Each structure stands twice: as structure tokens, then as C-alpha cells.
């Protein structure tokens, strides 16, 4: 889910080590637009989440730093034919969930899932994330008594639902990042 197409996956192989080398993780990469349209390479990234709960957020300086590092590699390797625009951003508060670990990290928060096949007569689900069991995502669906287990491989799109609780977590994450940035600046 971090990349949709074969071209996205090749770009991830090229750019993941670059992002990691400068201290970030790529959450999602999409090369969008066709031959006639201006193509756009969209990279969503974040700082790795640390044991103490800090990280996971990116500010404008982080986006610029990653953009410069990625641009150097893209210019040298030239993996994209034609012109394109590079966009680097944070995933935002109501972020996409693209890695199995995301479903564990955001346990207790509401999410929407879309599957590549029917499960119990539908492809779309909304509920509260209940963690991960092996390679399956656990989700508590409204009106259901038992926790549903969905194979991660079946999920084509997943996103957190914007709630007051999620907004509060986002504010706490930003505050922790700002405090960490201030401590590093004063050292």
C-alpha cells in the first residue's frame, strides 16, 4: 500500500534508503498523472516513532531536508521519464495507514479500510483499530460483538478518521516535537 504501481515500488526501492539516511520513513509514495498531464511525485514521510512516543511528525524544515536529499538521487538516477513535480509532505493527522505497524501504532483510533475483495458482503469497513495479530489487522466494527481480523494483504486503502481524540494526539505530538527541537537548538 505504500506504493500502488510497479513504478511506485521501484521508486520506493530507490528512495527508502535515502529517506532513512537523513532520518525519515516514507509512509506513502505515488507517481500521479499521465503522459499528457504534468506528472507529480508525491512522497508522504515522517520521523520514526521512538519508544518514548516522540517522532512521527514532520515540519516544513524536515520536508525541505528530505526533498533536497531525494532530489539529488532522482536527478542522478533519472528513474522518471519526462517532467514531474516533487511534493514532500507529512501524512497529516488523518493519515493513511500503509504499513502493518501503523495499525498497531494507532490502536484505539477510528479508521476506514477498503479491501480488494468482498468480506462479509462488502469491501469498505469503518471501526476502531484493535491492533495487529500476525499479518492481520484487528478492527472493532460498530454493531459487531467480535473483533474482525482482516488480512493486511487484502487492504488497498486505509485511513484514520478525524476525531477529537485524534486531534488531541496530533497536538501532543506537535508539542513534543517542538520541545525536542527547542532542546536541540539550545544545546
Swiss-Prot record:
<dbReference type="InterPro" id="IPR035956">
    <property type="entry name" value="RimP_N_sf"/>
</dbReference>
<protein>
    <recommendedName>
        <fullName>Ribosome maturation factor RimP</fullName>
    </recommendedName>
</protein>
<dbReference type="GO" id="GO:0000028">
    <property type="term" value="P:ribosomal small subunit assembly"/>
</dbReference>
<comment type="function">
    <text>Required for maturation of 30S ribosomal subunits.</text>
</comment>
<keyword id="KW-0963">Cytoplasm</keyword>
<dbReference type="InterPro" id="IPR028989">
    <property type="entry name" value="RimP_N"/>
</dbReference>
<dbReference type="InterPro" id="IPR003728">
    <property type="entry name" value="Ribosome_maturation_RimP"/>
</dbReference>
<comment type="similarity">
    <text>Belongs to the RimP family.</text>
</comment>
<dbReference type="InterPro" id="IPR028998">
    <property type="entry name" value="RimP_C"/>
</dbReference>
<dbReference type="GO" id="GO:0005829">
    <property type="term" value="C:cytosol"/>
</dbReference>
<dbReference type="Pfam" id="PF02576">
    <property type="entry name" value="RimP_N"/>
</dbReference>
<dbReference type="GO" id="GO:0006412">
    <property type="term" value="P:translation"/>
</dbReference>
<dbReference type="InterPro" id="IPR036847">
    <property type="entry name" value="RimP_C_sf"/>
</dbReference>
<keyword id="KW-0690">Ribosome biogenesis</keyword>
<dbReference type="Pfam" id="PF17384">
    <property type="entry name" value="DUF150_C"/>
</dbReference>
Amino acid at each position: 500500500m505504500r506504493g500502488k504501481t510497479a513504478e511506485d515500488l521501484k521508486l520506493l526501492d530507490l528512495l527508502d534508503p535515502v529517506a532513512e539516511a537523513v532520518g525519515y520513513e516514507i509512509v506513502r509514495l505515488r507517481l500521479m498523472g499521465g503522459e499528457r498531464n504534468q506528472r507529480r511525485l508525491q512522497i508522504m514521510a515522517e520521523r520514526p516513532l521512538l519508544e518514548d512516543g516522540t517522532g512521527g511528525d514532520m515540519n516544513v524544515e524536515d520536508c525541505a531536508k528530505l526533498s533536497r536529499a531525494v532530489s539529488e538521487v532522482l536527478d542522478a538516477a533519472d528513474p522518471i521519464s519526462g517532467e514531474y513535480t516533487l511534493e514532500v509532505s507529512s501524512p497529516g493527522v488523518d493519515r493513511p495507514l500503509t504499513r502493518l505497524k501503523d495499525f498497531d501504532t494507532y490502536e484505539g483510533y477510528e479508521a476506514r479500510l477498503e479491501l480488494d475483495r468482498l468480506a462479509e458482503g462488502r469491501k469498505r469497513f469503518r471501526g476502531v483499530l484493535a491492533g495487529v495479530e500476525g499479518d492481520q489487522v484487528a478492527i472493532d466494527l460498530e454493531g459487531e460483538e467480535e473483533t474482525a481480523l482482516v488480512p493486511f494483504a487484502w487492504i488497498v486503502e486505509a485511513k484514520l478518521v478525524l476525531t477529537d481524540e485524534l486531534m488531541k494526539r496530533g497536538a501532543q505530538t506537535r508539542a513534543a516535537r517542538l520541545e525536542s527541537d527547542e532542546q536541540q537548538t539550545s544545546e
